UniProtKB/Swiss-Prot annotation:
One of its GO terms (biological process) is glycine decarboxylation via glycine cleavage system. Disulfide bonds: none annotated. The glycine cleavage system is composed of four proteins: P, T, L and H. Belongs to the GcvH family. One of its GO terms (cellular component) is glycine cleavage complex. Keywords: Lipoyl. Binds 1 lipoyl cofactor covalently. This is Glycine cleavage system H protein. It comes from Staphylococcus aureus (strain NCTC 8325 / PS 47). The modification N6-lipoyllysine is found at residue 63. The keyword Heme does not apply. Its cofactor is (R)-lipoate. InterPro entries: 2-oxoA_DH_lipoyl-BS, Biotin_lipoyl, GCV_H, GCV_H/Fam206, GCV_H_sub, Single_hybrid_motif. It comes from the Bacteria.
Amino acid sequence: MAVPNELKYSKEHEWVKVEGNVAIIGITEYAQSELGDIVFVELPETDDEINEGDTFGSVESVKTVSELYAPISGKVVEVNEELEDSPEFVNESPYEKAWMVKVEISDESQIEALLTAEKYSEMIGE
């Protein structure tokens, strides 16, 4: 199971890629495999404020609905609108096509507190 080294991870199975002062957030390959076929993705609006630990959307699969938890706080600067019409991207390409939101980072220390790829791999038993 892919756990890219350049990303950071939350215990709730979100990944974070930092580009300057923006964090790109999605769900991990492990999370999508546990959920099964994704049929719907609900995301926040651009300019919404999200807070670390709070829900910022949900992913619906044929099995269940799973909340998305913000790994960091900040302002949503972009939403992946392709997921509205193509939720299957979450299964097919969790780290590329299926990024969910881009967030302006409000607290750098929250990035440092996330798991490394090695720690996340240990957590999921890889």
